[in-house]
């Protein structure tokens, strides 16, 4: 199979499809996130009597399993499939975060230096629609709340979930979401989970206006035991409206954030920022932003989520997302060699419908892309593609 890229032609891509809509007890699968396990590097506190065989890395593909329909509310579980052969085949489906018949969603997994996998996510009542939450018609107990759980055995079993809403969600915030896609652990050990929220409206506004969309991130300096808010980017002028956000640590230690910009929903006569992406940098591990989010017109996309991955050999920052500015289609990987300032297309998957995605480093020679796609619509499957690193350089 031959795939066209922005600069080269790749003939070694391998695809698999871990999730098909309408199968395995779920009407729809949405919101992919993917990580790979790794050997712990943190100090071992107990003596090891005999040599330990290092297990091969395991890929963990998460998404929302939507039981009754493709709607963003309702009975939704976070489900997982594991691959021990680099994404060529996948094990059985596991429901790893359930909220009864209510919602558990927006998976934000991150693999720590200890080998532990954190899964930050949100929970809400099944009937809490986005519109009702934005309008303030949902009581806090039924609204979007934040939880975390972990696995110490490469995703085979999971701890009970622990609520952290009080540590990371301010009173008055209405909508709330983590990532979607993987979170990151910085070289300092800090865990950074991008998020977004909405503010309560003023005047005669209803709360559904895009100008109330805002960005923030969650931070943990003790490997997920306790949490705090990092930067909070709130500006209701309607120019940049931060939504779903992804992050990567750059080689110089700065954190780069890239967000879906919902400025297209701003109402005249407010000026609209160019394009549908915005970005920002942090020089203090996500605690603050050097500047607020500003437009990133170098990434041509529709209004949609995207994913980031920083490679270190070579030093390239990757972005995945649809490249058709008017439709969720044309899944493409773009690359930046200057920390997100400029971008170029490097690898086009195909011209089919496509939407949300997540990137992962599979091994030294391979990047993985987990993405929503289909022949007649972007939400028919969640597919995994192995991409040679050489196709991105």
Question: Model-predicted segments: where are they?
Answer:
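Asp-box/BNR beta-propeller blade signature and adjacent active/binding-site loops
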Residues: 6-47, 51-393
């Amino acid at each position: 199979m031959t795939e066209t890229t922005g600069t080269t032609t790749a003939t070694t891509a391998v695809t698999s499809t871990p999730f098909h809509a309408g199968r395995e007890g779920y009407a729809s699968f949405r919101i992919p996130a993917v990580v790979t396990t790794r050997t712990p590097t943190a100090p071992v506190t107990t003596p090891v009597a005999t040599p330990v065989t290092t297990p091969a890395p395991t890929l963990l593909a998460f998404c929302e399993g939507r039981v009754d329909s493709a709607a963003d509310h309702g009975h939704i579980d976070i489900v997982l499939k594991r691959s021990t052969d680099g994404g060529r085949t996948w094990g059985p489906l596991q429901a790893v975060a359930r909220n009864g018949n209510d919602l558990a969603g927006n998976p934000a997994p991150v693999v720590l230096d200890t080998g532990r996998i954190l899964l930050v996510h949100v929970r809400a009542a099944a009937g809490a629609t986005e519109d009702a939450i934005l309008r303030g018609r949902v009581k806090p107990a039924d609204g979007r709340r934040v939880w975390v759980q972990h696995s110490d055995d490469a995703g085979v079993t999971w701890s009970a979930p622990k609520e952290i809403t009080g540590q990371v969600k301010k009173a008055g915030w209405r909508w709330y979401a983590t990532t979607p896609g993987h979170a990151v652990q910085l070289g300092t050990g800090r865990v950074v989970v991008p998020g977004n929220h909405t503010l309560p409206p003023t005047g005669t506004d209803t709360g559904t206006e895009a100008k109330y969309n805002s960005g923030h991130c969650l931070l943990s300096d003790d490997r997920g035991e306790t949490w705090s808010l990092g930067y909070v980017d709130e500006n209701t002028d309607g120019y940049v409206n931060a939504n779903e956000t992804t992050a990567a640590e750059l080689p110089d230690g700065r954190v780069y954030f890239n967000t879906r910009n919902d400025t297209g929903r701003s109402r005249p006569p407010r000026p609209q920022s160019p394009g549908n992406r915005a970005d920002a940098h942090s020089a203090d591990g996500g605690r603050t932003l050097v500047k607020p989010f500003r437009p990133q017109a170098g990434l041509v996309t529709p209004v949609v989520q995207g994913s980031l991955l920083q490679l270190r050999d070579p030093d390239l920052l990757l972005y995945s997302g649809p490249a058709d500015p008017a439709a969720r289609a044309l899944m493409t990987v773009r690359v930046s060699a200057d920390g997100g300032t400029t971008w170029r297309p490097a690898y086009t998957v195909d011209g089919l419908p496509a939407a949300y995605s997540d990137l992962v480093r599979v091994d030294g020679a391979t990047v993985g892309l987990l993405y929503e796609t289909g022949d007649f619509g972007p939400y028919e499957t969640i597919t995994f593609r192995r991409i040679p690193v050489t196709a991105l350089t």
